[in-house]
Amino acid sequence: MAHVALIPGLSRGSVGAVCTQAASWGLKASTLRHLTLASIIKSRRKTDHLERTASVLRREVMAAAKVCEITHESPSVKSLRLLVADKDFSFKAGQWVDFFIPGVSVVGGFSICSSPQRLERDRIIELAVKYADHPPAVWVHNKCTLDSEVALRVGGEFFFDPQPTDAPRNLILIAGGVGINPLLSILRHSADLHRDHADKGRSYEIGTVKLFYSAKNTSELLFKKDILDLVHEFPEKISCSFHVTKQTAQISAELKPYVTDGRITEKEIRDHISAETLFYVCGPPPMTDFFSKHLESCHVPKEHICFEKWW
C-alpha cells in the first residue's frame, strides 16, 4: 500500500431501479455491530483483506449501505451503486471500503470508483467487483440483489485530496484490470475539481490528467464510455490511452483512436516525467512493482509515486 498522507478521523486497525430515499431505511446499530464484529472474528485467512490491510489507516465510521443499482460492466465485472445515508461517512478519491456482508464471514475489500462529490450530492458510492472464488465476490455476482444491505468502513492511504491553496499538479494514472477503480475515482474527482474551479474560481486548480489503462481486451476495459465522456468534456485537461494485450474482436470506430495493441511501455510513462507530475499506479502486483521501480530509476521522488496492489 502506498503512503500519501495521514487523514484526520482515521484509525488503524443489469441496471436496477432508481435509488430510494436515504432516510427510509437503515440497519439497526446492534445489527451493524454484530455483523462487523462477527465478520472480523471469523475472517482469518492469511490472504484475506483484513489481514493484508491490518496496518492501514481506516476511518472510525461504520455505515450501513443499501444496494440501489447493479450493472454488468464487463463479462467478468459487476458494479454496485450503494446508498449510504450516514452523513458522517466520507472518503478521499482513491480509497477503498471494508465490505461486510450479512451471512458471509469473510470481509471484502473493494476500491470506490465514484467521486467524493457524488457521495456529498447524492449519498451514492460505486464499486466494481470482478468475479472470483473469494466469498465476497461470489456474493456480489450470485446473491446480491436490489435492496441488499451491507456495512462499509473506509480505509486506505492511496488517495488524491488536494487543498484549494495547493499548487497545481499534473497526474499520470496507470491502471491494470480492475486497478482502474481507485484511479477512476481520482479521475472523476479531478473533473469535479475542474468544474468547480471553472464555475467558482475558488477550488483547487487541477493540472493535466493522463490515464494509461491496460486490459486483456476492449470488453474488459471498464467504464470506457465514462472515461471518454470526460476526455471529450475536458479535451485540454484530460486524455487517455487504452492498451489491450489479447484483442481478437474488431475495435469500434469510436474507441479505435484511443486503443494501442500491447502493454503500456516505459517510454510512454517516461515521456511524462516532470517536477509537477504525480504518478498513481494500481493493478496486479507485478505491474505495480514494475512501474513504481521504473519511476524511481528515473529519479522521480518517492513522494510523487503513489501505488496500490490488489490481489
UniProtKB/Swiss-Prot annotation:
Highest taxon, organism lineage: Eukaryota
Binding residues for NAD(+): G177, V178, G179, I180, N181, P182
Enzyme Commission number(s) from the entry: 1.-.-.-
Domain FAD-binding FR-type, residue spans: 60-171
Stored InterPro entries: FAD-bd_FR_type (IPR017927), FNR_nucleotide-bd (IPR039261), Oxidoreductase_NAD-binding (IPR052128), OxRdtase_FAD/NAD-bd (IPR001433), Riboflavin_synthase-like_b-brl (IPR017938)
A GO cellular component annotation in the UniProt record: mitochondrion
GO molecular function: oxidoreductase activity
Keyword check for Oxidoreductase: yes
Keyword Acyltransferase: no
Keyword annotations from UniProtKB, A to Z: NAD, Oxidoreductase, Signal
Signal peptide positions on this chain: 1-16
Name the UniProt record assigns to this protein: Oxidoreductase NAD-binding domain-containing protein 1
Lineage: Eukaryota, Metazoa, Chordata, Craniata, Vertebrata
